[in-house]
Amino acid sequence: MTAKGSTKQEILDAALELLSVQGYEATSISQLAEAVGIRKASLYSHFENKQAILDALMQATLEQYEQHSIFAKADWDDPAFTKDKENMTPDMAVQLCLGQIRYILHDPQISRARKMLTIEQFRNRQMASMQTKRNYTDVMSYFTGLVRFLIRRGQLAEADPEIMAAQLCLPVSVWLNLCDREPEREAEVTRLIERHIRQFFDVYRAK
């Protein structure tokens, strides 16, 4: 990476850190330049304005999400995707969910991006759409697909797949948001999620 490219990335990293705490309106170009250790005028050689920095951050966040999220990659009509889920057990479901949750909570970029989206979703329509897609639409689509798949395989009882998926994943989303606000409660939340998933499989296990 060139020196200019390195500085540009440093600006984006500093911007993500500041925006995830202060939000867009409260973060100034002067603060960003100071965080990187460059003059304000120098920052403009990398980005035209603050909005350009935000746009670049949104693009980087979207690319990372598409690359790493299990929800973005789901294709329940693809045998290669479903192969390792054919004999899904409660233990497997627990590990699947907890693995994704740990990644979301502990990857610095993803964690900060989530907080930035939470702050900015009420000001920026594009961020609101991204927040809905990442935290609701894709999650519900993934778990609805999983439930339908397990019903077809005779592992779960016949019921409304979308409602079953909501019962499974939406409480987890609430607990995940709790961890964002109170990270010291992660161990408690992890135990709750495990109990929740196991009870779901007990309730809906095919007779």
Task: Name the predicted role of every residue range.
Residues 1-6, 76-77:
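N-terminal intrinsically disordered/low-complexity leader segments
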Residues 56, 69-108, 164-165:
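Hydrophobic alpha-helical connector segments
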Residues 50, 57, 61, 65, ...:
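Hydrophobic/aromatic residues within well-ordered alpha-helical segments
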Residues 129, 133, 137, 147-198:
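Hydrophobic/aromatic-rich alpha-helical bundle segments in the mid-to-C-terminal region
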Residues 105-118, 122-152:
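Amphipathic alpha-helical packing segments from all-alpha helical-bundle domains
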Residues 10, 18-60:
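Helix-turn-helix
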Residues 27-28, 109-113, 159-163, 188:
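Alpha-helix N-cap and coil->helix boundary residues
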Residues 16, 20, 24, 62, ...:
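Short amphipathic alpha-helical interface segments enriched in basic and hydrophobic/aromatic residues
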